[in-house]
Regions:
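His/Asp/Glu-rich metal/cofactor-coordinating catalytic motifs and the adjacent surface-exposed loops
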Residues: 2-87, 91-95, 135-141, 145-331
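Short, flexible active-site-proximal loops enriched in glycine and acidic residues
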Residues: 111-115, 127-135, 176-179
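Structured, charged N-terminal subsegments at the starts of enzyme catalytic cores
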Residues: 84, 94-113, 117
Length: 331
């Protein structure tokens, strides 16, 4: 983790920001809120927001994001290859259509769109790995939207059996006779714990055996599903605990035995995305670790963490304004 030893610029804490004469609720702070949680706000939006309390506005933004319907599935969203009349002609057209759809979602979708983008960069995949196959693009995007503000543990559980991810990180090839470690390694290193953070190579090897069995589809390009015939049914030892370990049991054990590491890793990424890419040991102790404890106490529901961070003095501190590099959608 990128932790420096220099004193932080922003020393405000996680206590709720309550405007005062010395620290008023201003149009500048409203712009800051909507730049971070959406893609800006117009003058009418600022005028409508000024009479409200910051906490009320934050709750409204989060509640709206939670209740926002997922983008409707296109007609081809769950096709297998045989469902296309002319795959070579139709699939590229569907890919182009989907790019236009998701660009519009991003601009109009507020916080849900922000978090969808965040999670797509966290649970990263690569188009070339699954042939830019439009149905898998949709299914992956739908998964990111569905869980964007939900339960992180259930999000991790769903990602690992998503067809796009199974293809990208070779879970589709991971069988009892020929185990593949790619997904198990990334599950620990990129998705939950962070690099070299309280797991071993042997944990990866053993976990990969629990992840076997997702090697079946009814037709190429269809959704991939579990079949016990290719699952490794022998005992596995992960984090020093020996069990027979199904996929679900592995995820449960990961979150039971490594909850602190997971929570701190994810809250660090949330902090870097929404507040500042740079932080120090004081920020880690005073901001990130308490957010991580909130995540644990909430059984890995993300919304309480977001509410706590976005309502905080730390988030609204003047030294937090204007320090995040814009992406193309922000300009």
């Amino acid at each position: 983790m990128e932790v420096t030893t220099n004193p932080p610029c922003n020393t405000a804490l996680l206590e709720e920001y309550i405007p005062s004469g010395e620290n008023p609720w201003t149009s500048q702070k409203i712009k800051h809120l909507y730049r971070r949680l959406a893609y800006g706000v117009n003058l009418a939006g600022i005028d409508a927001t000024l009479p409200l309390t910051p906490a009320t506005v934050v709750d409204s933004i989060i509640d709206t994001a939670i209740n926002l319907p997922q983008t409707a599935a296109p007609s081809w969203g769950y096709f297998s290859i045989s469902d296309f009349a002319d795959f070579d002609l139709e699939n590229p057209a569907n890919v182009s259509q989907w790019y236009i759809q998701t660009a519009g979602d991003t601009i109009e979708g507020g916080l849900r769109a922000r978090l969808t983008m965040f999670w797509m960069n966290h649970f990263v995949t690569e188009l070339d790995s699954y042939g830019s196959y439009a149905p898998y693009m949709f299914q992956y995007y739908n998964l990111m939207q569905t869980h964007a503000l939900g339960n992180f543990k259930e999000f991790v559980r769903a990602v690992g059996v998503n067809s796009t991810m199974l293809i990208y990180l070779n879970g589709f090839e991971n069988t009892s006779n020929n185990p593949n470690e790619n997904y198990a390694r990334e599950l620990f290193e990129l998705f939950t714990l962070g690099e070299n953070n309280n797991y071993t190579q042997e944990d990866i090897i053993q976990a990969s055996r629990a992840l076997t069995g997702y090697n079946h589809w009814d037709d190429p390009g269809a959704q991939i599903y579990f079949d016990q015939s290719t699952w490794d049914e022998s005992p596995k030892t992960v984090f020093g605990s020996e069990e027979f370990y199904t996929y679900d049991e592995l995820i449960d054990t990961l979150f039971e035995l490594r909850e602190t590491e997971i929570a701190q890793f994810i809250c660090t990424k949330i902090y870097k995305y929404f507040v500042s890419h740079q932080y120090d040991v004081i920020t880690q102790e005073d901001i990130i670790n308490p957010l991580a404890q909130t995540l644990i106490d909430a059984n890995f529901e993300m919304a309480p963490v977001l509410r706590q961070l976005f309502k905080s003095q730390h988030f609204f501190d003047d030294r937090a304004l204007g320090i995040v590099i814009k992406n193309p959608y922000d300009v």
